[in-house]
């Protein structure tokens, strides 16, 4: 049997490849393919630090919005789109999921929520959290299981995304440097990947502040809390440079003295 004559196939221009897209505003994403690695703690801290530096930040939450809002001192009674002042700048929290978040980042922009200088994204612990192109991707890990998931996530990360590896929990710096090299090699990322050399400690003082909606940047700068803040400052500095190329993060206002620091006692606070 002779088949019927086929019609000609006409070309249709394709959308831009997702691995070359760039967000409408400078965007930092904090993501890990594992829960419990202080992901929301880091994203909220970075957003607040940028605001303290004088810019207006959109904090886009694609994970549990209530958790992120609570960490910024926003109650359930506050509006869905809530804004908090931090120094001369502000953080506006918006909860969007899936294609709605992508539409805001890459197509429509955040204009309906206000004017912003930068976007910080907090994602759920899923692989697609590392698949956003053209962003600064901060990826916390806290051990072998988390690192194995992280490697699988980074293998799917677009080439135009910059990656920052962060170690949560105290381990020797040399051990973390070795592990960071293993992660980079196993994820096939020879370029566009850096790491924070000092592991970030989990401190009760930081955890309690976030659970109460208090900014970590108002805590006494001592002991392990100071170590955490130094790491947060470095990450915020990268996010700032991503948003304001050629400039450096303005220094934080000096802390108010809070008395003597007792080594071994305050360190565990």
What are these regions (language model features)?
Residues 1-34, 55:
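Extreme N-terminal, non-catalytic leader segments
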Residues 31-34, 52-118, 211:
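P-loop/Walker-type NTP enzyme "switch/lid" segment
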Residues 39:
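Conserved lysine of the Walker
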Residues 42:
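Hydrophobic positions on the alpha1 helix immediately C-terminal to the Walker A/P-loop
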Residues 114-129:
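Glycine-rich phosphate-binding loop used to anchor ATP phosphates in small-molecule kinases
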Residues 126-144, 162:
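Inter-motif core of Ras-like GTPase G domains
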Residues 168-219, 228:
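Beta-strand-loop-alpha "switch" segments that mediate conformational coupling across diverse proteins
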Residues 215-269:
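NTP-binding/hydrolysis catalytic cores, primarily Walker-type P-loop NTPases
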């Amino acid at each position: 049997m002779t088949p019927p004559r086929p019609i000609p196939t006409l070309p249709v221009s394709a959308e831009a490849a997702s691995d070359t897209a760039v967000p409408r505003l400078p965007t930092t994403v904090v993501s890990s393919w594992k829960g419990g690695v202080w992901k929301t703690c880091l994203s909220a801290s970075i957003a607040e630090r940028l605001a303290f530096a004088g810019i207006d930040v959109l904090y886009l939450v694609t994970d549990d919005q209530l958790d992120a809002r609570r960490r910024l001192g926003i109650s359930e009674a506050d509006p869905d789109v809530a804004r908090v002042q931090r120094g001369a700048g502000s953080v506006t929290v918006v909860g969007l999921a899936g294609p709605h978040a992508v539409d805001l980042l890459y197509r429509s922009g955040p204009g309906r929520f206000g004017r912003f200088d930068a976007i910080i994204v907090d994602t759920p612990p899923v692989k697609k959290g590392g698949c956003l192109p053209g962003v600064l991707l901060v990826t916390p890990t806290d051990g072998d299981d988390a690192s194995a998931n992280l490697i699988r996530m980074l293998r799917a990360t677009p080439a135009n995304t910059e990656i920052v590896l962060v170690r949560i929990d105290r381990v020797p710096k040399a051990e973390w440097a070795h592990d960071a090299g293993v992660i980079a090699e196993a994820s096939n990322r020879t370029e566009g990947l850096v790491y924070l050399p000092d592991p970030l400690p989990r401190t009760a003082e930081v955890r309690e502040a976030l659970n109460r909606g208090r900014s970590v940047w108002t805590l006494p700068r001592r002991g392990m809390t100071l170590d955490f803040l130094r790491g947060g400052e470095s990450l915020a500095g990268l996010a700032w440079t991503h948003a304001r190329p050629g400039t450096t993060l303005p220094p934080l206002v000096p802390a108010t003295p809070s008395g003597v620091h007792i080594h071994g006692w305050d360190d565990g606070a």
